[in-house]
């Protein structure tokens, strides 16, 4: 199972962990993914989808259908 948001395509970011003595080591910052069952009003069905919490906030603001269309995602495949 890949750690990629199915709506936005957000994935892990490579960063550095910096200690108090300024020793830098590589660190992977993962996306906060959640499995959600969302109601798709236009399709009149439930959609099981793995999305980031940032995408979930956007869906609550503008709606699932509008957000999916703006990101070029077809909800029929879910």
Swiss-Prot record:
The answer to whether UniProt assigns keyword Magnesium to this entry is no
What SUPFAM superfamilies does its record include? L28p-like
Q: Which UniProt keywords apply?
A: Ribonucleoprotein, Ribosomal protein
Taxonomically, the superkingdom here is: Bacteria
Answer whether the UniProt record assigns the keyword Zinc to this protein: no
| GO terms for MF | structural constituent of ribosome
Any one GO CC term of the record? ribonucleoprotein complex
Q: Which GO terms describe its biological process?
A: translation
Q: Which family does it belong to?
A: Belongs to the bacterial ribosomal protein bL28 family.
Q: Which NCBIfam families match?
A: L28
* The protein's name in its UniProt record: Large ribosomal subunit protein bL28
Q: Which organism is it from?
A: Prochlorococcus marinus (strain MIT 9215)
């Amino acid at each position: 199972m890949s750690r990629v948001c199915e709506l936005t395509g957000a994935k892990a970011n490579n960063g550095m962990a910096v200690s108090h003595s300024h020793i830098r080591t590589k660190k992977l910052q993962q996306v906060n993914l959640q499995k959600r069952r969302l109601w798709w009003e236009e399709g009149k069905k439930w959609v099981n989808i793995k999305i980031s919490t940032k995408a979930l906030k956007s869906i609550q603001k503008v709606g699932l259908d509008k957000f999916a269309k703006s990101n070029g995602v077809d909800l029929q495949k879910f």
